[in-house]
Regions:
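Short SAM/SAH-binding signature in class I
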Residues: 146-158
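C-terminal substrate-binding/active-site "lid" region of AdoMet-derived donor-dependent transferases
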Residues: 159-238
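Surface-exposed cleft-lining segments at the edges of enzyme active sites
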Residues: 33-37, 124-125, 160-165
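S-adenosyl-L-methionine
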Residues: 101-149
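Short, conserved loop/helix-junction motifs that constitute active-site signature segments
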Residues: 79-81, 147-148, 177-183
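Local beta-strand N-terminus motif with an aromatic residue
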Residues: 57, 150-152, 184
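SAM cofactor-binding core of SAM-dependent methyltransferases
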Residues: 38-122
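Rossmann-like AdoMet
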Residues: 1-39
């Protein structure tokens, strides 16, 4: 049965969620970051940070890099007792990947994250006319960052999917990386309120049997957890 489309988010609900999230993110201080419209919403980023802290995620892969990458590195840098973190941020744009890498180095957190430059190329899992990350570059980057261990948090915020005809650009993420996910892993899809991402979620659910908790109005993200360990859900936005 098809999942009905989400209603449009109430502007005030978004404002309240993001305002509360900004207060939480103030605990990750550092230099000013250029937060643009394409960045993950503050409420979505807090949902990701909650999963890392509450469920002890240590092997994180982020598709699409930027402000979220820098803030996640700040979080990991704050919490040395957790230890053993392996983080890969996959980016198709070489110039932007370099900016993120340099920003991490300026903040002294460059050792926390491996920036993987993987250009967008034709891919067998992509829709006709669309591209996904170069398989060889992605595999090599994940091999370096994960060192053969399974991913326990996958954040899908790339490649760009906002342009006309690009709504399904992020579909390959789950079928392409499913075999790399460990038991109990969390999958997060950003921009879950958009029609293209809603269709991606429907396909993922139909093909994998996963159920995505759609938090688009409050956080902008949809979240699912694979079978396995019983995670603590942690605080949620109301």
């Amino acid at each position: 049965m098809a999942v009905p489309d989400l209603p449009p988010p109430h502007p005030r609900s978004r404002e309240c969620s993001d305002e509360a999230a900004r207060h939480a993110l103030a605990a990750l201080p550092g230099p000013y970051l250029p937060w643009g419209s394409s960045a993950m919403r503050p409420a979505g980023l807090v949902a990701v940070c909650n999963d890392i802290v509450v469920n002890g995620r240590r092997r994180v892969v982020e598709l699409g890099s930027g402000i979220s990458t820098v803030l996640l590195a700040r979080l990991l840098n704050q919490r040395p007792p957790l230890g053993g973190f392996r983080v890969a941020a996959v980016e198709h744009d070489a110039g932007w990947a370099q900016w993120v890498r340099e920003q991490l180095n300026r903040e002294g957190t460059g050792s926390q994250v491996v920036i993987v430059h993987a250009p967008l190329v034709p891919h067998p899992l992509a829709e006709p006319g669309l591209s996904w990350y170069d398989a060889a570059a992605l595999a090599e980057g994940l091999r370096t960052a994960m060192r053969g261990e399974p991913i326990d948090l996958l954040v899908v915020d790339g490649p760009p999917a906002h342009g006309a005809g690009h709504g399904l650009a992020r579909y390959p993420a789950l079928p392409g990386l499913r075999d790399r996910l460990g038991p109990g892993a969390t999958v997060v899809l950003d921009d879950a309120e958009r029609p293209g991402e809603q269709e991606v979620l429907r396909r993922w659910e139909r093909e994998t049997g996963l159920h995505f908790d759609r938090r688009a109005e409050a956080t902008g993200v949809a979240v699912a957890r694979l079978a396995g360990e019983d995670p603590v859900t942690g605080p949620r936005h109301s």
